[in-house]
């Protein structure tokens, strides 16, 4: 739970897996309090690995509100893995909006309810988006102007 804003992940090592992995409790997906973070303004660039495929991985009962994300460089840029997480997205407890992914949503839940069609009805959501993947492109993306702030350019 809690809120994080203005996050950048830029992977280069092929052994790196998820750009974000969000879990509630691996031993009890229904455990309370339920993890329910709010994430805003994310730019996530994967390493292009065919073995470490996941960008945003939502599982183990987690809920999430994500507003403003670009995810590229992973074959599965957005993955849903457990029934509780799927249910929270399907019933609106979790909300994804303004999320652009360079690929398609993957729901690994048997009989999953939150599918590409649901994702695409969210405000500003897009699959197969053309997203810049070099650091210069990321830092120059005008829709994420905060990336050009002095605190970001100082750590490059």
Where are these regions (language model features)?
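Extracellular beta-rich repeat passengers
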Residues: 1-156
């Amino acid at each position: 739970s809690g809120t994080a804003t203005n996050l950048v992940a830029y992977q280069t090592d092929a052994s790196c897996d998820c750009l974000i992995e969000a879990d509630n409790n691996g031993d009890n997906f229904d455990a309370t309090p339920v993890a329910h973070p709010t994430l805003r303004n994310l730019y996530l660039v994967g390493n292009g690995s065919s073995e470490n495929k996941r960008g945003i991985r939502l599982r183990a009962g987690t809920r999430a509100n994500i507003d403003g994300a670009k995810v590229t460089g992973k074959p599965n840029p957005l993955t849903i893995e457990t029934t509780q997480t799927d249910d929270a997205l399907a019933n609106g407890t979790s909300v994804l909006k303004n999320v652009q992914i360079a690929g398609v949503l993957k729901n690994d839940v048997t009989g999953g309810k939150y599918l590409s069609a649901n994702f695409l009805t969210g405000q500003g959501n897009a699959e197969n988006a053309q997203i810049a993947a070099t650091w210069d492109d990321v830092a120059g993306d005008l829709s994420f102007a905060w990336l050009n702030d002095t605190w970001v350019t100082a750590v490059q």
